[in-house]
């Protein structure tokens, strides 16, 4: 197998107009469904004051973007954002698995600051 890097790299860049993905976008997981490719990816926000950490932090959300060709992604949306105590400091590094017609997403959730394994 030969893998060739796209001449259009990077295929996804931060979008300053979306504060939730304005700092960085990376670690994507592509999914093919219904003749489209969806990229589920980690999105890093601009630094902002986080009251629970008592400091400025960049928080990760998970975004999703569809594509017809796997290179040009449009209509990007926030897919998963921290809303539970166990993910209050970020949702990161998504992985998606399709099993018997259902899609399951796994991701890292950050519940503490400074970050540590629990």
Residue spans of the language-model regions?
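Beta-rich carbohydrate-recognition and catalytic domains
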Residues: 1-23, 27-89, 97-118
